[in-house]
Regions:
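Short capping segments at the starts of secondary-structure elements
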Residues: 28-39
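Minor-groove-contacting beta-hairpin "wing" of winged helix-turn-helix DNA-binding domains
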Residues: 78-86
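Short, amphipathic alpha-helical interaction segments positioned at domain boundaries
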Residues: 89-112
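A short, conserved structural fragment
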Residues: 67-77
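Exposed, interaction-prone assembly regions rather than primary DNA-binding/catalytic cores
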Residues: 112-129
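Short helix-coil junctions and helix-kink-helix linkers
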Residues: 42-54
Length: 129
């Protein structure tokens, strides 16, 4: 779970793991190549039209679980949506994009730490996270 995002990042519940996740895996396994990409919004629309309960944030958590547990190898995402890639350049670009996002988040973390540590307060303690 991620602090301050508890309801969005909590572990999958039984319904999500046993019912939704297999459906999502089955659907995404047909999305081979960028031209077959499907957006989070579209996946949620399809599932809710079939009376499944899903939110965009919980779908992202399901997809996180699928990736983290190697349930559908090389499932990547772009602004076009999610798809399985067998293209080496796409996979390298996706890994590079993830690294750039990590660096961006770390930069903001360091900026917030610096701002906190530099605030005018005599009784403050410095943050070293």
């Amino acid at each position: 779970m991620i602090t301050n995002f508890d309801s969005h990042t909590q572990e999958l519940n039984e319904y999500e793991e046993k019912i939704l996740q297999p459906i999502v895996i089955k659907g995404l396994s047909t999305k081979i190549g960028k031209s077959k990409a499907i957006t989070n919004k579209k996946i949620c629309e399809v599932l809710t039209s079939k009376d499944y309960e899903i939110t965009d944030t919980r779908l992202r958590k399901i997809i996180h679980n699928i990736r983290a547990n190697d349930l559908l190898p090389l499932l990547i995402a772009t602004s076009r949506g999610y798809y399985v890639s067998n293209d080496e350049e796409e996979i390298r670009d996706y890994i590079k994009s993830l690294s750039e996002r990590i660096n961006s988040i770390n930069f903001i973390k360091q900026s917030i730490q610096r701002q906190y540590n530099n605030r005018p307060n005599e009784n403050q303690t410095n943050l070293e996270l």
